[in-house]
Amino acid sequence: MNKFFILLFALLCFGCNSSQRYSNDLIQKGEKHFKNLRQLTFSGENAEAYFNLDGTKLIYQAHDGDSLCDQIYIMDIESGVSEMVSTGEGTTTCSYFEYPKTKKFIYASTHLGSKSCPEKPDYSRGYVW
């Protein structure tokens, strides 16, 4: 009977452990600076991402197979749901939340000049913005 209570106590102690364990394949072997790393986007090309002040939202530019023009999205970090907040026309870049309130945001866009995507630059001589 005594062994039963000891076993039950041990199971309860280990079962109630609240510390999260991260099985994180994104962290490279030998990395000393990350404890955990979480991938937030899973499709398309995503770039220039910035968190709002309290870390609950992420603003970023992205495009997928439907369009080769980057558009601006805001993601709710907890749910992972993203919403396009730019016009969907032209191409966009350089989005930021207004600080410190972060209720507004700003970004650059070509949509007033043309609703279509601009021609892709020649990358043969290196990066072109």
Where are these regions (language model features)?
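Residue-level detector of Asp-centered blade-edge/turn motifs that repeat once per structural unit
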Residues: 53-54, 99-101
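Short loop/turn segments that connect beta-strands within beta-propeller blades
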Residues: 76-80
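Sec-dependent N-terminal signal peptides
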Residues: 4-13
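A flexible loop/linker signature enriched in serine peptidases of the S9 family
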Residues: 42-45, 61-71, 87-92, 108-129
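Hydrophobic beta-strand positions that form the internal "hydrophobic ladder"
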Residues: 55-59, 105-106
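Blade/loop signatures of beta-propeller domains
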Residues: 20-35
